[in-house]
UniProtKB/Swiss-Prot annotation:
<comment type="similarity">
    <text>Belongs to the universal ribosomal protein uL15 family.</text>
</comment>
<dbReference type="GO" id="GO:0003735">
    <property type="term" value="F:structural constituent of ribosome"/>
</dbReference>
<keyword id="KW-0687">Ribonucleoprotein</keyword>
<keyword id="KW-0689">Ribosomal protein</keyword>
<protein>
    <recommendedName>
        <fullName>Large ribosomal subunit protein uL15</fullName>
    </recommendedName>
</protein>
<dbReference type="InterPro" id="IPR021131">
    <property type="entry name" value="Ribosomal_uL15/eL18"/>
</dbReference>
<keyword id="KW-0694">RNA-binding</keyword>
<dbReference type="Pfam" id="PF00828">
    <property type="entry name" value="Ribosomal_L27A"/>
</dbReference>
<dbReference type="InterPro" id="IPR005749">
    <property type="entry name" value="Ribosomal_uL15_bac-type"/>
</dbReference>
<dbReference type="InterPro" id="IPR036227">
    <property type="entry name" value="Ribosomal_uL15/eL18_sf"/>
</dbReference>
<dbReference type="GO" id="GO:0022625">
    <property type="term" value="C:cytosolic large ribosomal subunit"/>
</dbReference>
<comment type="subunit">
    <text>Part of the 50S ribosomal subunit.</text>
</comment>
<feature type="region of interest" description="Disordered">
    <location>
        <begin position="1"/>
        <end position="54"/>
    </location>
</feature>
<dbReference type="GO" id="GO:0006412">
    <property type="term" value="P:translation"/>
</dbReference>
<dbReference type="GO" id="GO:0019843">
    <property type="term" value="F:rRNA binding"/>
</dbReference>
<keyword id="KW-0699">rRNA-binding</keyword>
<dbReference type="InterPro" id="IPR030878">
    <property type="entry name" value="Ribosomal_uL15"/>
</dbReference>
Length: 146
């Protein structure tokens, strides 16, 4: 038996029939429409915001603050060794990485990490490196200038 797109249907009992609320006693959900009697949640725009605990100090206020987002980390691009092959020429700097679209234009610093293979020798200028990346570049015949 083949399955055709025009024969797709939800499983039996997976979809419930919509109940019209507030339409008489016989419907089972007349008058208050399943909302109970009085109170904030029975009103038309009733309801509490997410995280509200009925006036009790909420969990996000009971727990201490922690950590922060480093702005330097947001402006530092991580470049893999394998991405260096996109750079034209032998010199790798922040400007050449931006020109090759390896690093976004708004990044103010970059760091080369040991990931992937290096295809040719490069001279790295003014870009941070991890120990492993530095060793891999020097092993391939490249050099690192601070």
């Amino acid at each position: 038996m083949t399955l055709r797109l025009n024969e797709l249907a939800p499983a039996e009992g997976a979809k419930r029939e919509h109940r019209r609320l507030g339409r008489g006693i016989g419907s089972g959900v007349g008058k208050t429409g399943g909302r109970g009697i009085k109170g904030q949640k029975s009103r038309k725009s009733g309801g509490v915001r997410p995280g509200f605990e009925g006036g009790q100090t909420a969990i996000y206020r009971r727990l201490p603050k922690f950590g922060f987002t480093s702005q330097i980390a947001l402006k530092t691009a991580e470049v893999r060794l394998s991405e260096l092959s996109k750079v034209e020429g032998d010199i790798v700097s922040l400007e050449t990485l931006k020109a090759a679209n390896v690093v976004r234009r708004d990044q103010i610093r970059a760091r080369i990490v040991l990931s992937g293979e290096i295809t040719r020798a490069f001279t790295v200028q003014g870009v941070a490196l991890t120990k492993g990346a530095k060793a891999a570049i020097e092993a391939a015949g490249g050099k690192v200038e601070e």
